[in-house]
């Protein structure tokens, strides 16, 4: 069974970056196309609102104000308007930042972790190997990996719940496009 607990899911975005089409589409051109910084709000009946990634926030521009990180915003220009961050959109929906108890991070690119610091009570669920791949990198290598360490809160490690350390892998039905699955909340 994939899930036994009904949850609602809202797919949202907080800004977008521009990148040449040919880097992601076979036969694409060099024209820049928008790639929305998507995130999801899951409403769980027992655990409350849960975020899957955050998209960008204005903090991205603070973190990329100086070299070498400023190269990031020139190589991959970001378009973000005040009022579209995850924290602001959730407030509009009546959800305070402190209500987010869990945040699932797919990986550590800036368009996925841009708003992480806006949620002071959230615990972070992620695959240990995805964090291990970036967190000790120097400034240039981190930049090449799309990782801006300043987007993470100072107490990130203390608030971390690496899923592969607390939850066993779950079997997947044949034909699934993923190789790993975990029951993040122990509810099926």
Labelled PLM ranges:
Residues 55-57, 109, 130:
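Catalytic metal-binding/acid-base residues of hydrolase active sites
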Residues 9, 42, 53, 100, ...:
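Divalent metal-coordination and catalytic microenvironments
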Residues 7, 16-88:
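Conserved beta-strand hairpin/beta-sheet module of binuclear metal-dependent hydrolase folds
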Residues 10-12, 50, 104, 125, ...:
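Hydrophobic/aromatic beta-strand patches that form the interior of the parallel beta-sheet core
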Residues 50, 59-62, 111-114, 133-135:
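Short catalytic/ligand-binding loop motif for oxyanion handling, primarily in non-cytosolic enzymes
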Residues 78-95, 99, 129-188:
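Metallo-beta-lactamase
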Residues 2-9, 44-49, 184-188:
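Beta-strand-turn-beta hairpins that frame and shape the catalytic cleft
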Residues 65-126:
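Active-site metal-binding motif and surrounding structural segment of the metallo-beta-lactamase
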């Amino acid at each position: 069974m994939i899930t036994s607990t009904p949850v609602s899911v809202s797919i949202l975005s907080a800004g977008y970056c521009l990148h040449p089409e040919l880097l992601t589409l076979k036969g694409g051109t060099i024209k820049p196309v928008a790639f929305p910084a998507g995130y999801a709000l899951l409403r769980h009946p027992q655990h409350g609102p849960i975020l899957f990634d955050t998209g960008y926030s204005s903090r991205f521009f603070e973190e990329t104000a100086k070299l070498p990180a400023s190269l990031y915003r020139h190589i991959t220009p970001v378009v973000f308007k005040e009022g579209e961050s995850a924290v602001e959109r959730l407030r509009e929906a009546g959800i305070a930042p402190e209500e987010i108890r869990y945040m699932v991070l797919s990986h550590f690119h800036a368009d996925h972790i841009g708003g992480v610091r806006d949620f002071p009570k959230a615990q972070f669920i992620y695959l240990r190997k995805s964090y291990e791949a970036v967190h000790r990198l120097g400034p240039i290598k981190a930049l090449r990996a799309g990782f801006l360490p300043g987007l993470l809160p100072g107490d990130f490690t203390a608030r971390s719940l690496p899923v592969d350390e607390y939850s066993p892998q779950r079997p997947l039905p044949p034909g699934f496009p993923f190789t790993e699955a975990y029951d993040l909340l122990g509810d099926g």
